[in-house]
């Protein structure tokens, strides 16, 4: 008998009138022990249940947020047939800044790129960053932050976490960017805090954080935004 369940949680409190969405499991029987044939089976499974896994745009990473440099890169990509420019790590772009000035700056660049047949995207760092004792995930072994997958990381179900996702979505809605490169995407860190607004404690922390980040990825997929994230999110686009 196959038993599939989370190692922790969900420990979800379902209020009257609410709906609970559980996890999905895909089973695929093989008709052969041949390694190559099994590989083809796995490929067909991913193409069927996650067709976005076939997306493979030709893109350029750009480490500058200077509008003149970005336009030059767009022109170069249009000339050689590249499909996308990602304003990447070290560029200075801040997708968490949803001020009118920042939105206007990047929307004008998105419009310029689209007129050239090129899409524009951006980078954002999430997990491997230290915010504060009140925001970061709490290690259940120590009762303090630190010692997690990337050292320390913000809890996605803190007020800071929800604000982060609101800012990212707002930035994409208003600029029209079509690629999101997420660095240090949620790696499964648990959080023992009992003071974060959107989870109760350790038992529901992983479940709620995972669903928070996949909600963003699903929204992006629904709106034609290419997501450059680790493979283990392929089935949650």
Task: Identify the meaning behind each predicted range.
Residues 1-136, 162:
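Conserved structural scaffold segments of CAZyme catalytic domains across common CAZy folds
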Residues 104-105, 137, 143-237:
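Active-site neighborhood of glycoside hydrolase catalytic domains
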């Amino acid at each position: 008998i196959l038993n599939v369940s989370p190692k922790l949680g969900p420990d979800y409190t379902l209020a009257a009138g609410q709906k609970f969405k559980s996890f999905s499991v895909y089973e695929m029987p093989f008709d052969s022990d041949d390694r190559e044939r099994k590989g083809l089976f796995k490929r067909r499974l991913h193409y069927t249940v996650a067709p976005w896994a076939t997306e493979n745009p030709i893109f350029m990473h750009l480490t500058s947020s200077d509008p003149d440099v970005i336009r030059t890169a767009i022109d170069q990509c249009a000339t050689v047939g590249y499909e996308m420019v990602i304003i990447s790590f070290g560029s200075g772009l801040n997708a968490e800044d949803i001020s009118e000035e920042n939105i206007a700056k990047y929307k004008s660049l998105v419009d310029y790129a689209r007129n050239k047949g090129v899409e524009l995207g951006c980078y954002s760092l999430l997990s491997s960053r230290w915010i504060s004792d009140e925001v970061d995930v709490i290690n259940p072994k120590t009762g303090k932050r630190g010692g997690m997958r990337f050292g320390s990381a913000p809890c996605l179900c803190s007020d800071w976490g929800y604000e982060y996702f609101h800012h990212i979505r707002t930035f994409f809605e208003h600029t029209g960017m079509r690629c999101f490169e997420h660095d240090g995407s949620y790696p499964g860190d648990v959080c023992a805090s009992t003071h974060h607004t959107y989870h109760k404690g350790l038992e529901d922390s992983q479940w709620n954080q995972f669903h928070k980040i996949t909600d963003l990825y699903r929204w992006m997929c629904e709106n034609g935004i290419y997501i450059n994230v680790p493979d283990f999110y392929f089935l949650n686009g």
